[in-house]
A protein has these predicted regions:
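Non-catalytic beta/alpha edge segments that cap or flank active sites
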Residues: 1-137
């Protein structure tokens, strides 16, 4: 069995959803960009938006419609506070949800943060052949 890495570099957009972060202190977004580039992927675009479902939906819809975008990673807005609206904003955009992703994410998180992992509404799916992953901030 070959152990060579046949990575196909992807063009990925990163969106941070936060009412308190700025480009200067967006540590989650910075980490995601560094991690995807370290694996050989390309940053297609990056944005930081407040917790506003209509702004989120508009930005992600634009990226989904762009044939040059292979994937989108959204960080933030997946909790249970009154302003957290990432799932409500983006689930309607999916053509297909990725069953089990949220459960797996919470199971892995449980090993590090215990029952606090239950506060995440992480999810993933596909829209217009673009993969979408929504993670806690």
């Amino acid at each position: 069995m070959s152990t060579s890495n046949n990575l196909v570099p992807l063009s990925i957009c990163v969106l941070t959803v936060s009412d308190s972060r700025t480009p200067d202190n967006d540590t989650s977004g910075d980490w995601l960009v560094q991690a995807l580039q370290a694996e050989g992927h390309r940053l297609a675009a990056r944005a930081l938006l407040p917790d506003n479902r209509y702004l989120l939906r508009a930005q992600v819809s634009q990226w989904i419609a762009d044939e040059d975008v292979d994937g989108i990673i959204v960080t933030g807005g997946t909790g249970f506070t009154g302003r957290d609206s990432t799932p409500e904003a983006l689930l309607p955009l999916l053509d297909k949800e990725m069953p089990g992703f949220g459960e797996l994410f919470r199971a892995i998180s449980f090993e590090e943060i215990g029952t606090s992992s239950l506060q995440s509404r992480a999810f993933a799916g596909v829209a217009n052949a673009t993969f979408l992953f929504c993670l806690p901030g």
